[in-house]
Amino acid sequence: MEALTTSRVVPVQVPCRKLSSLFANFSCLELRRYPCRGLVSIMNHPKLLRPVTASVQPHELSTLGHEGNIVPSKEILDLWRSVEAVCFDVDSTVCVDEGIDELAEFCGAGKAVAEWTARAMGGSVPFEEALAARLSLFKPSLSKVEEYLDKRPPRLSPGIEELVKKLRANNIDVYLISGGFRQMINPVASILGIPRENIFANNLLFGNSGEFLGFDENEPTSRSGGKAKAVQQIRKGRLYKTMAMIGDGATDLEARKPGGADLFICYAGVQLREAVAANADWLIFKFESLINSLD
C-alpha cells in the first residue's frame, strides 16, 4: 500500500499498572510433529501461565489532525451496530505489547527487532520480509519460548474484556487475526473466551531438540495481505453479511476490501500510526467508545 510507506508512528505514552484479578488456569503449549522429519511446533502443551494481566490508563490525547474520523458518521455507526463478526488484531490492540518485540527483548535482541516491527507495521517493507528478518535476529528456542510464556503473562488493553463480552452477548462472533505467534495468542484467547478455531496467526517451528527452525509460511498471516485473505476466508466460510476489522497497523487496514471487512476501526490507544489512522473509517483511543455505541 503505497500510501502507507511514509507512515509516522506516534507512541502513545501511557502509565501501566498490574492488576490482581485472577483468571482460570489454561493451557498454552503443545508439541506437534510435522510430516517433515525433525520438524516440531508448539501448540497446546499443558503448561500453566500465572493468571495475571496488566492494564493501562491512556492519557487524553490531541486528535493530531484526524478530527474527520474520530466522531463516526451515522453510516459508520450503523455499520458497526450491524456487524455479525469482529476481527481483532492482537499486538498493540487486544494486548498493549508487540509480542515479537517482547519475546525478542526477553531473548536479548529487543532494540533491533523493535526497529523492524515499526517498519513492518507502517507498511514500508513487506510483512514476510520483516517477520523473517526479526526472527533471524534472535532465533528463539522452544525452551526460551516456554520460559517467556511462563514469566510474561498477557497484558490486555483496557476495556477489551468488556468489549468482547458485549459483542458475544449480542451474538457477534469474535476472531483474533495476528501476524504474531499462535503460541503467544492462545493464552489471550483463553482469557477472552475466544475459541481456538477463531484464531488466525503464525506458528513457530522447532526441531526435535527444540532448536528454532523458522515459521510456517503456509499461514496466510505470514505475508503481506494475509490478514485480508484471512478475513475473506472467514466471510466466505461463515457467510457473514457485515464484518469489522479493528487494529493499529497497515496489515489491519488491508483487511478492508471487497469480500473482506466492511469497516476498519483504527485503535490508537497504544500506537498511533498516522497513515493508518488517516485511512480508517473510525479512529478510537479507548474501547469504551465501541462499547457505548452498542447500547
UniProtKB/Swiss-Prot annotation:
Q: What is its EC number?
A: 3.1.3.3
Q: Transit peptide: which range?
A: 1-54
UniProt GO molecular function: L-phosphoserine phosphatase activity; magnesium ion binding
* Gene Ontology biological process: embryo development ending in seed dormancy; L-serine biosynthetic process; L-serine metabolic process; pollen development; root development; sulfur amino acid metabolic process
Activation and inhibition: Approximately 60% inhibition of PSP activity is observed in presence of 10 mM serine.
Name the residues that bind Mg(2+).
89, 91, 248
Reported function? Catalyzes the last step in the plastidial phosphorylated pathway of serine biosynthesis (PPSB). The reaction mechanism proceeds via the formation of a phosphoryl-enzyme intermediates. Required for embryo, pollen and root development. May be required preferentially for serine biosynthesis in non-photosynthetic tissues.
Protein's UniProt name: Phosphoserine phosphatase, chloroplastic
- Which classification does the entry list for the species? Eukaryota, Viridiplantae, Streptophyta, Embryophyta, Tracheophyta
